[in-house]
Amino acid sequence: MQQRPQSITARVALATSLHRWAWVARGNGLADTVTAESWRLFNERIQRPQSILEGAAKLPPPLCPQWYSEMMIVGLAQGWDAGRMKDIFDRVIQAELGYFYLDLQYANYLLPKWYGNAGDASSFAKNSADNVGGDAGDEPYFQIAIILISRGNGNFPVQEMDWARIQPGYQALCTQFGTTNRANNQVAFMAYKFRDASVARQQFEIIGDRWARGVWRDRQFFDRARDWAQGHDS
């Protein structure tokens, strides 16, 4: 920032680092699982990225698309109401930035564990994908499904999502960017959640022993899901 005082990107990058530091204190669990000291640290730390982002908004346009994403994370932390959060999201839609990470942030905000009601997040995922249409819409549907199912703390009803649409979304992602071990783990994880043993087995065979901690959290969960897939014929 000192070398490039007019750089929006530098400010957004700093805000990203700071808000992650704030969430380290809080964690991603439900509010009643957070200690008083963790809340204190979280509320103290989250103030600075908001201040930095507000300062970045005063710089000459255009705003970096990631600015909106980071501001939505601040909004989640600050408990913004639905109208204020949607205003940020709608500004991105109107600018036609094509930045699907905003969809991920908004879908996460709509989870019941945060500020949405049952069905809000899954309806948003469907509408977003339908608005794009085709393979181009299925791809973000896959990405949003990962967010909703993995961040729902085991309480998100997977049947709200369309497994038949998630799978072509994964294929569209692979076609555009190629496959990754993390993506393979994500599909195996969702196949387990949807109780699709056939797809789960295929992915576990590809994965081998290369389990992704960011997907499964611990090795025991990975082993349990793999054992389940291998023990079922359908």
Question: What residue spans do the PLM features occupy?
Answer:
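Short coil/linker segments at helix-helix boundaries
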Residues: M1-Q6, T16-G133, E139-P168, I206-D233
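Short coil/turn motifs that N-cap or connect alpha-helices
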Residues: A10, F100-Y101, T180
